[in-house]
Amino acid sequence: MGELTKLISAWEEYTQKNGTASATAFCMYYLAQESNNDLFGGLTPPDIDTTFAKLIGRLANMQTAYSKMALQELPGFELEWFYFLNTIYHLKEVRKTQVIQYNFTEQTTGIDILNKLKNLGYIAERTDPEDKRAKLVSVTKTGEKILFKVYQLLHKPTLLMYNDIDHKDKQVVVNILKDTETKHQEILSTVKQKSIDDLLSETLGEEKMAAIMQEREKMFRHWNAKRLKEK
């Protein structure tokens, strides 16, 4: 397919979906699509939400991979230990259950990590005076020492990934995402036995959720047909 034919086909497809389309709006849309094609090796996700989620997810996976590389300087130290130590350090003295919830960890896995940190002398534990059934944990001097060492190591992946991005651009992204992070921290800490559909219904309402899912099915069918046509 020639470049001009490709552009005309894209314009026709765009105008069918957007009756009052302008050339400027189309150009912005087309450039965004082409950019996403390059980003994901030609297999562009069917909508901007999925593109957004995929990009953030891949960046998170890359950060994890680089972080594990950096921690090779501390043989035996697990990345999950850092998350727990960091949480306890910033929350001061805190209940075990709060640490586990904050890190979205299964109860048994979280208890296992906390026990390892305690056995290594990185955290101390005492009974909560307000609730004898609960345990409070805090970071020890030994824990602080190892935590500050890990801070230095884990700055390397951050530097590698994000140093080239302009500070103002990074601040814009932080401003956009911080409320979402806070909102879902609260949701996940109280989720208990709810399903993802329960959470969607509570957040969007059942009617809106059904309409979105129906539109999503149509979008996916269109996207899949387009993908097969381009093969």
Per-segment meaning from a language model:
Residues A60, L147, E181-H184:
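A structural signal for well-ordered alpha-helices, especially hydrophobic packing surfaces
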Residues A60, P75, K92, N103, ...:
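Flexible interhelical turns and helix-capping residues at alpha-helix boundaries
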Residues K116-Q171:
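Charged, amphipathic alpha-helical coiled-coil/dimerization segments
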Residues M1-L74:
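N-terminal leader segment of winged-helix/HTH proteins
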Residues Q152-K229:
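Terminal interaction helix/tail motif
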Residues K68-T105, T109:
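N-terminal helix-turn-helix DNA-binding core of bacterial DNA-binding proteins
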